[in-house]
Amino acid sequence: MEINDLLLDGLENLQRMIQKGTGGLTPAELKWQPRPDAESIGLLFFHIVRVEDMATHDIQGKKPLWVAEQWYQKLNMPADAGMGHLTPAQIAAFELPKEWQTYAAAVRNSTVNYLKGLKSKDFDRDVVVPPPPGQPAKPAGSAPPPPLPFTPTVGGILIHMLTALSARGGKIDYIRGRQGHG
């Protein structure tokens, strides 16, 4: 099995987990929070897709589809939606847009096409990780940023992405269970 096939299989498993976790839920259940400062299933699903979009396009040196294809406008949301730390009020107010699945499908299609084109040597390529949206780059001569929680290579970023998305998928299952859905 090639590395990209392993990642594609992991993303397919994650997609099944998310479909099971979000399937059949009402808008109120997607918005339900186990605590006032906890993310809802809808917000977790939102983050999963946005993180995949950013990570896979950052390593290609491209803008995420969210910006490049103006999904933020299509979904009537700010360009920086879902980035950074949200206040409890922002978390409580979040509602997953009705057309979210269309954006999620576009992101996954883009990811699959990118991964299918990678060769084993491509995973070792170093990547300059841009600062998070809304955070300026460090000026020359300033203290170095804290170490990244992953190796800044194509492979390191993709593995970190898959791990982070899987953790959010587990949270979705937990919240679904808290609402009485198996």
Predicted features by range, described:
Residues 22, 26, 116-119, 176:
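A structural signal for long alpha-helical coiled-coils and helix-turn connectors
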